[in-house]
Swiss-Prot record:
Protein name per the record: Class I hydrophobin 3
Function statement: Aerial growth, conidiation, and dispersal of filamentous fungi in the environment rely upon a capability of their secreting small amphipathic proteins called hydrophobins (HPBs) with low sequence identity. Class I can self-assemble into an outermost layer of rodlet bundles on aerial cell surfaces, conferring cellular hydrophobicity that supports fungal growth, development and dispersal; whereas Class II form highly ordered films at water-air interfaces through intermolecular interactions but contribute nothing to the rodlet structure.
Statement: the UniProt record of this protein carries the keyword Glycosyltransferase: no
Keyword Chloroplast: no
Practical and industrial applications: Vmh3 can be efficiently used in surface modification applications such as antifouling agents, in modifications of biomaterials used as implants, in designing drug delivery systems for water-insoluble drugs, and also in food foams.
Record-annotated disulphide pairs: 28-87, 35-81, 36-69, 88-101
Primary residence: secreted
Subunit structure, interactors included: Self-assembles to form functional amyloid fibrils called rodlets. Self-assembly into fibrillar rodlets occurs spontaneously at hydrophobic:hydrophilic interfaces and the rodlets further associate laterally to form amphipathic monolayers.
Subcellular localization, as worded in the UniProt entry: Secreted; Secreted, Cell wall
GO molecular function, one term: structural constituent of cell wall
Positions annotated with a glycan in the UniProt record: 37
Organism: Pleurotus ostreatus (strain PC15)
Domain of life of the organism encoding this protein: Eukaryota
InterPro entries listed in its UniProt record: Hydrophobin, Hydrophobin_CS
Amino acid sequence: MFFQTTIVAALASLAVATPLALRTDSRCNTESVKCCNKSEDAETFKKSASAALIPIKIGDITGEVYSECSPIVGLIGGSSCSAQTVCCDNAKFNGLVNIGCTPINVAL
């Protein structure tokens, strides 16, 4: 029984410790850092009603799609980002839906 508990705990620790794909360069324009409340993979996004809101070819979308984003600058001194912090320097579309953003690790 102890062995099984140890194995389950080790596997759970490994799952929690697995890193997300983060930016490899440390540069991100501060105006490009956003706090996004919603993220979904591109395939799920393509099937959603939100996909009709963007003026690009849906077939070109890959990776993660972020929405309900607000600038981090607007959060300083107020509430913190309790969702996903992303850098949108190379975003294909920047507005209601953000495509091409990269998750970043920021302690706010």
